């Protein structure tokens, strides 16, 4: 579940898959509006550059908020000259592009169910406190109805 308050001072790690960026954008907006100086990073996984929702606003927010670092991960098509091949979020990408577990950040993960479960498992495997990994998911759960 996602609850972020402007008086929270711990670092914030946001990880979005596709349209899961929408609630995380709200956190980033609130963080900026509050003038909160705690570190905040957003790793945004999309199929290709044209699939990034609110890309212009995210990039503008990152350019004016010294605390926000925005990183894209492209799963199918990366833009020319991109520094990584297309692929899913994995342990190596998280190690390179997210806050280390030692900072005791609160991690917010939102996206399709499979994405959220995989990323949450990777975060815990990297040493993040499971109590600080907050998730929101959408889509099928795999159960029969």
Where do the language-model regions lie?
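FNR/FR-type flavoprotein reductase catalytic core
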Residues: 1-145
């Amino acid at each position: 579940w996602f609850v972020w308050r402007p008086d929270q001072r711990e670092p914030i790690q946001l990880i979005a898959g596709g349209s899961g960026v929408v609630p995380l954008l709200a956190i980033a907006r609130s963080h900026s509006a509050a003038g909160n100086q705690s570190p905040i990073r957003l790793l945004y996984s999309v199929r290709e550059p044209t699939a990034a929702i609110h890309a212009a606003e995210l990039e503008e927010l990152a350019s004016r908020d010294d605390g926000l670092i925005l990183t894209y991960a492209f799963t199918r098509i990366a833009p020319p000259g991109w520094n990584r091949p297309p692929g899913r979020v994995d342990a190596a990408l998280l190690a390179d592009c997210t806050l280390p577990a030692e900072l005791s950040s609160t991690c917010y993960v939102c996206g399709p169910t499979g994405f959220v479960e995989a990323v949450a498992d990777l975060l815990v495997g990297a040493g993040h406190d499971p109590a600080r990994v907050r998730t929101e998911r959408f889509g099928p759960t795999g159960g029969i109805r």
